[in-house]
C-alpha cells in the first residue's frame, strides 16, 4: 500500500521556533504519562486536567507535548492513542522550555521547545502504520540515550547504596511481568503497581516497578525471556523491604522495547542461546532470591523472630535476618517425603503432579511448557530459644546446602541419603532468612532460606554471647 504521509509534508521538529503558526507535525509516540487533575485556581472548586507525551520524528529530535483542559477532553484525547503509535498534531503552540525546571519531571529532550495543545484550536490524529513512512516507525526501536550509556544489573547491585536515589539508564531482558495490583490510599486515591523482573548476563533477577497506568499497559505487552528493554532515566532505590536495589519507572522514564542496537542484540542472542539449554540458570532465576546477602545484617534468635513476627501482624512486607541455628529436621531419606519436584520453566511454579501441567501457565493443555527438576525441601531450624518449623529450602540454595546437584541426589542410595542427612543435622549453621506473615503457613510465618552454610565457631560464639548464650 502507498505511504500517504511522507515526512516532507510536515514541519520537522528540528525546525521549530516560537513564531510558527498553522503547524502540522507528525511523529511516533515514545513516552506518555497518566491523566492528572489539579485544582483550578481561576474557578474555585473545579479541576483542570492534564497529561503529556513525547513524540519523535528523527533519530536526533524529539519533544514533549502537554495538553490542559476539561476532564472529558483530556481523558478522551489520552485514550485515543498509545505509546508506539504515530500521530499527527495540528496547530500546537510552541513554547521555549525552562530546561532545569521542566526536565526535573519530564523526559530530557534535545529540543529547546515544547508543544502545548489547546482544546479549542489543536487536533491530534492517530495514523495507521500502513500510512506512515517506515523510517518513522523504526524510531520506536531507537533509545533516546547513547546505546552504551547504561548500567548492567550487576553494577547496580554491586554499587548498592551509592546509587540510592540516582536516575540512570538500564538495558535488560524481561524475566517476568507481574499482574497489576490495585489499591486505595489512606486519602482515598486509587493507585496501581506492577512488578517486572529483569535479568541480563550478569544478574539473574532484578525488580523494576511501574506505578502508572501507561507504563503498566506497556509492560503487559512484553514477552518473558523474549523482550529486551532500554529504560532511560529510571530511579534506583534501595528497597528496604526486600533488602535489595530496585528500579522505578518515573515520569522522566522512556522505555524503548527491543532496541535496535549492538548491545541489545548481544543480550537478545544471550537470551536465545540460554533459553532452553541452561537449566541451571533457569533454576537460579526462579528459585534463588535476588537479594544481596551483604545487606542483611540483623542477627536474631528463633524467639526474637517470632516476637518480631507478632509485632508485624497486619503487614504484608517480608523481613530478613540472620540466624545461628541447627537443622533439626531434614527428611531427605524418607521415601514417603517428596523432596524433588517438577517446576515450570516458564513461571517457576511447582507442576501439578496429577495433570502433569502448570496450573499457572497452562489453562489450555495444548500449550504445555517444559519443566525442570528442583529441590523442594522443608526443614526445621532450632537454636537455644526454640524451633522454626517447615522452613523452605529449594532450588540452587538447596543444592549448595546439601553439597550435591539434583542429578547426583537422584542417583544416591537410601544409605547415602541418610549419611548426607547426618552430615548436616545438628551442625551449627549461619542461615540467612526471608520471613513473611502467612495464615497458610505453619505458625503463621512463611520462612525461606536464602543461604545456609556451616558457621564459623568464633563468629557464632561472639554473636550468641551478645544474646546471652554461648
Swiss-Prot record:
Biological process annotations from GO: double-strand break repair via homologous recombination; female meiosis I; fertilization; homologous chromosome pairing at meiosis; male meiosis I; male meiotic nuclear division; resolution of meiotic recombination intermediates
Gene Ontology MF, one: single-stranded DNA 3'-5' DNA exonuclease activity
Signal peptide span: none
Tissue specificity: Sprecifically expressed in early meiotic germ cells: in adult and fetal tissues, detected in fetal ovary, postnatal testis and liver. In the ovary, expression starts at 12.5 dpc, reaches a maximum at 15.5 dpc and decreases to become undetectable in post natal life. In testis, expression starts at 10 days post partum (dpp), reaches a maximum at 20 dpp and is maintained throughout adult life.
Location in or out of the cell: Cytoplasm; Nucleus; Chromosome
UniProt superkingdom: Eukaryota
Keywords from the UniProt entry: Chromosome, Cytoplasm, DNA-binding, Exonuclease, Hydrolase, Meiosis, Nuclease, Nucleus
Top-level EC class as recorded in UniProt: hydrolase
Annotated Pfam families: OB_MEIOB_N
DNA-binding feature ranges: 167-272
One annotated Gene Ontology cellular component of this protein: nucleus
Job description of the protein: Single-stranded DNA-binding protein required for homologous recombination in meiosis I. Required for double strand breaks (DSBs) repair and crossover formation and promotion of faithful and complete synapsis. Not required for the initial loading of recombinases but required to maintain a proper number of RAD51 and DMC1 foci after the zygotene stage. May act by ensuring the stabilization of recombinases, which is required for successful homology search and meiotic recombination. Displays Single-stranded DNA 3'-5' exonuclease activity in vitro.
Subunit and partners: Component of a multiprotein complex with RPA2 and SPATA22. Interacts with SPATA22. Interacts with the complex BRME1:HSF2BP:BRCA2.
Identification of the protein by name: Meiosis-specific with OB domain-containing protein
Origin species: Mus musculus
Amino acid at each position: 500500500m502507498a505511504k500517504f504521509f511522507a515526512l516532507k509534508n510536515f514541519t520537522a521538529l528540528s525546525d521549530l521556533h516560537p513564531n510558527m503558526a498553522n503547524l502540522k507535525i507528525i511523529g511516533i509516540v515514545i513516552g506518555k504519562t497518566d491523566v492528572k487533575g489539579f485544582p483550578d485556581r481561576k474557578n474555585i472548586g473545579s479541576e483542570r486536567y492534564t497529561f503529556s507525551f513525547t513524540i519523535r520524528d528523527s533519530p536526533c529530535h524529539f519533544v514533549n507535548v502537554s495538553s490542559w483542559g476539561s476532564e472529558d477532553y483530556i481523558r478522551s484525547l489520552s485514550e485515543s492513542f498509545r505509546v508506539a503509535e504515530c500521530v499527527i498534531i495540528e496547530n500546537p503552540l510552541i513554547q521555549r522550555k525552562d530546561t532545569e525546571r521542566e526536565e526535573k519531571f519530564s523526559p530530557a529532550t534535545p529540543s529547546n521547545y515544547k508543544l502545548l495543545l489547546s482544546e479549542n484550536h489543536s487536533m491530534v490524529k492517530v495514523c495507521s502504520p500502513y500510512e506512515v513512512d517506515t523510517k518513522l516507525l523504526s524510531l520506536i526501536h531507537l533509545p533516546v540515550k547513547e546505546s552504551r550509556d547504561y548500567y548492567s544489573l550487576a553494577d547496580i547491585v554491586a554499587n548498592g547504596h551509592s546509587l540510592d536515589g540516582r536516575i540512570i539508564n538500564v538495558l535488560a531482558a524481561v524475566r517476568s511481568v507481574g499482574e497489576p495490583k490495585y489499591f486505595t490510599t489512606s486519602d482515598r486515591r486509587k493507585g496501581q503497581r506492577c512488578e517486572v523482573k529483569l535479568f541480563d548476563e550478569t544478574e539473574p533477577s532484578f525488580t523494576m516497578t511501574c506505578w502508572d497506568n501507561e507504563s503498566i499497559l506497556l509492560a503487559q505487552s512484553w514477552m518473558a525471556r523474549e523482550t529486551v528493554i532500554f529504560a532511560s532515566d529510571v530511579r534506583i532505590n534501595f528497597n528496604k523491604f526486600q533488602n535489595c536495589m530496585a528500579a522505578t519507572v518515573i515520569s522522566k522514564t522512556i522505555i524503548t522495547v527491543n532496541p535496535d542496537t549492538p548491545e541489545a542484540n548481544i543480550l537478545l542472542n544471550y537470551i536465545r542461546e540460554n533459553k532452553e539449554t541452561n537449566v541451571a540458570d533457569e533454576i537460579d532465576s526462579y528459585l534463588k532470591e535476588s537479594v544481596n546477602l551483604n545487606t542483611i545484617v540483623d542477627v536474631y534468635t528463633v524467639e526474637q523472630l517470632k516476637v518480631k513476627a507478632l509485632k508485624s501482624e497486619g503487614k504484608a512486607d517480608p523481613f530478613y535476618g540472620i540466624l545461628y541455628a541447627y537443622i533439626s529436621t531434614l527428611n531427605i531419606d524418607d521415601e514417603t517425603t517428596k523432596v524433588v519436584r517438577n517446576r515450570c520453566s516458564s513461571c517457576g511454579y511447582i507442576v501439578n503432579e496429577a495433570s502433569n501441567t502448570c496450573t499457572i501457565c497452562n489453562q489450555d493443555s495444548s500449550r504445555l511448557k517444559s519443566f525442570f527438576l528442583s529441590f523442594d525441601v522443608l526443614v526445621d531450624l532450632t537454636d537455644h530459644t526454640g524451633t522454626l518449623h517447615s522452613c523452605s529450602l529449594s532450588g540452587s540454595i538447596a543444592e549448595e546446602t546439601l553439597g550435591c546437584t539434583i542429578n547426583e541426589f537422584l542417583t544416591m542410595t537410601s544409605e547415602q541419603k541418610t549419611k548426607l542427612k547426618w552430615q548436616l543435622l545438628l551442625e551449627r549453621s549461619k542461615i540467612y532468612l526471608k520471613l513473611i506473615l502467612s495464615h497458610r503457613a505453619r505458625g503463621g510465618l512463611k520462612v525461606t532460606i536464602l543461604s545456609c552454610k556451616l558457621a564459623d565457631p568464633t563468629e557464632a560464639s561472639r554473636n550468641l554471647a551478645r544474646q546471652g548464650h554461648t
